[in-house]
Design a protein with these regions (language model features):
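Acidic, PIN/NYN-like endoribonuclease modules and their adjacent C-terminal/linker elements
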Residues: 122-155
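Short acidic-hydrophobic, aromatic-tinged amphipathic segments that line or gate anion-handling sites
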Residues: 70-77, 149-155
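Alpha-helix capping/helix-boundary segments
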Residues: 10-11, 40, 80, 120-121, ...
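Structured helix-beta-strand junction loops
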Residues: 31, 67-71, 128
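Short, well-structured N-terminal submotif of metal-dependent ribonuclease cores
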Residues: 1-65, 92
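Phosphate- and divalent-cation-binding pockets in alpha/beta enzyme and binding domains
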Residues: 43, 83, 143
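Active-site neighborhoods of divalent-metal-dependent phosphate/nucleic-acid chemistry enzymes
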Residues: 46, 72-135
Length: 155
């Protein structure tokens, strides 16, 4: 599959008509497609639910997602779990917890600063051979996923 997978920050920037991002999107060849995965859309939905925000603005974002993003949504599949598992295993082996009794979530978040949703998004990009567009550093994840190309189009 050719194309790009947008992380949440790029989808939000797209909806906000970020000039740098829009210029890159408009310069893409017609056969290069831009996608978002279910995890990214879930993060946006969670953001809506966790804020009391402006309902008019929320509706505008939902309209944008329905028109431009949802038709290009990539679902999390049974195959995605394999890529997710490989990334998690690599993270664990690279920096195991000091104490065996430390939980996986605690170790990833508190020690490595890894957001589990980011692992899923990277797994989705890897599975489909897509370049991941993100502003997040994801340093520890990048260090264990040489198969994935990361780009930031918001600079």
């Amino acid at each position: 599959m050719n194309g790009f997978l947008m992380d949440t920050n790029h989808v939000i920037a797209w909806e906000a008509r970020n000039p740098a991002l829009i210029a890159k999107l408009e310069a893409l060849p017609k056969n290069d497609l831009v996608y978002a995965c279910a995890i990214t859309l879930g993060e946006i939905a969670a953001g809506h639910e966790m804020t009391s925000g402006d309902l008019v603005r929320r509706h505008q974002v939902e309209q944008f997602l329905n028109l431009y993003v949802l038709p290009k949504e990539i679902a999390i599949t049974l195959y995605t779990r394999s890529y997710y598992g490989q990334i998690m295993g690599r993270l664990w082996r690279r920096t195991p917890p000091a104490k065996p009794s430390v939980s996986t979530d605690s170790h990833l978040v508190n020690t490595l600063g890894v957001n589990v949703n980011d692992v899923w998004i990277v797994a989705c990009a890897w599975e489909h051979g897509l370049i991941l567009l993100t502003t997040d550093s994801m340093t520890n994840i990048r260090n264990v996923t040489p198969e994935v190309t990361f780009e930031n189009w918001l600079v």
